[in-house]
Amino acid sequence: MCGINGYVGTRGGAIEEMNSKTLHRGPDSSGIFQDSHITLGHNLLSIREVLEASKQPVTKPSSPWVLVFNGQLYNTAAMKEKLDKAYSGVDLDTTLLFGLIEKYGWNFIKHIHGMYAIGLYNKEEARLCIYRDPTGQKPLYYYAKGSEFIFSSEIKGILAHAHVDRSVNEESVLLATMLGYIPGSGTLFSHIHKLNPSEVLLLDCKNIQITKEYYHSDARGYYGDKKPQEVFTNLVAEHLQSKQKVALNLSGGMDSSLLLHEMSQVGHEMHTYTNRFEASDEKFNRDADLAKKLAKDYGATHTEITITKKLYLDNFIESYAAIEEPNYNITVPTYLITAKQEGAHGDKNRVILSGDGGDEVFAGYPHYWEIRRMEKLRRLVSSPIFNLIKNRRNGTSFDFSHAEDQWYFFRRMHDPILKHKVAYDRNLLSSITQPFMQNYGVKTDPVYQGMLMDRVLWLAGENFIRSDKIYMSQSVELRSPLAYHPFRQYFDELLSSSDYIEKSGNKKFLRNLYRGKLPEYITDRSDKTGWRSPLANWYDKTFQTLFLSIIEPMKKSNHIIDWERIARQIEEKEMWPGKHIHAYLSLAILAQQYDIEL
């Protein structure tokens, strides 16, 4: 895992500043490439191999190619088979990737699977392409205005260029107030964008001409004739590739529990982490209790990280600032506290496994049950009548035959608190989802369609952005095996509507597969708290004071958002105002960090 940076041109000192701003992503080594058209930079977090073999940008004297790469590729065995015998003893994915580039040129992308953000430059063509992986696990940002083009793994890398236009993207602000984050390609800045999953940007460095397109990553046949249980074991074995120890975030839920089981099956040393919340309602530590019990049953070395109210408040501003984008998730400070304990300044882990991504493959969220129930109701009455009933009850104007409307109905955060009222517009979402749906939306099952919506809008737009920024701030690579694209495609083809949900709960197929392997207290549990901080219990005057201190400087702008109204919501309530307030707190933190008006 690393940080990649670059820009068109040869401005002295700029790449060094970009590398410096993103050094936390790769503290082991920094490198630079420059020719008359482009400057590229790289920060290395060494995971697989000795330092010298891992350094980037990758070049060869006789080759026109220059590579900067952030991520991990897991199909290294298949990559070796496509290269000559000189690569037979190579384990480093970067070396294998460069070998494929030399063999296949721009078509290399058809032969790799993993999580990645890639910058590839051809010196002879003066052409740059930047790529984001199909699941969106690795963010990649770019700035495009006039003859200027800059890209980086993080927004702060782009803002290292002092002249960058910081004009605000009002549409992105609207999305943040509707959803609590910004899905798709938008950021708070009009001229800074992020690549979407499966998107490639092509840049003619001589004429500064940009084209964008989507590539289809076809992983059919990846697992051959393997049965589902074999696929899980193979998946985890591939994701354990590392010269460093690999630990696991163990939540007590199905997804992380099955990862622990598969780690034990391949004989991997098991180190697990979970959170315990100080002085909170018993229900908030139910998951911690189960995780502790499961770790003991499997003989894992288990660490509990205690989250106190003081720690939460002390890390509040830093955690939301680290994400660089607005975020409504109330557990953001908890994630940072956890990453600090696990990472470079704590236990010095470099690789952590996470169960993220399983809910969007095996229908884990409660709203999937509701989607199926609504579909049954729509069959009983005509769609217009159904829409009328639901809209009258909720004061909205949705057409539930559209996946975007149905998704927004369940996923919307709160009515936006803006200076001027704005109505929901389906086009805001469909412009993001349609390219993705054209490649992967082959099944019409409403639960599957709901999972696709979550994959492209929420998982890539919120979850992976948050987890990447938080963990990389502590020089830790977070891997999410259950979001692996070949794994997704295998189960998307295998499962149907009847496999997702049963009367006893969601994840029907997964629970049945692991019954008899995992303990019943995991496979048969009907409730899961999730890693949610107990703010309703903790909230007091110290929270209110902090929240108001963050909002107060924003009152003088009042340009897009009604900050006065938000302040009143905090002032007038003795209880926690709700998760929507965290979206506005994060917007205020970022506005002050970036010196912009909202």
Named regions from a protein language model:
Residues 518-574, 578:
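PAPS-dependent sulfotransferase catalytic core
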Residues 86-92, 167-170, 328, 441-454, ...:
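Structural motif
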Residues 98-102, 172-182, 454-461, 579-595:
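Short, hydrophobic/amphipathic alpha-helical patches that form generic packing surfaces
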Residues 484:
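Short, conserved phosphate/pyrophosphate- and ester-handling motifs at nucleotide-, phospho-/glycolipid
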Residues 1-323, 350, 516, 564, ...:
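Cysteine-centered catalytic environments shared across enzyme families
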Residues 77, 488-492:
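Short, solvent-exposed hinge/capping segments at secondary-structure junctions
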Residues 501-523:
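Charge-dense polyanion-binding interfaces
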Residues 292-476, 522, 526, 548-551:
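Glycine-rich active-site loop/lid subdomains used to bind and stabilize high-energy intermediates
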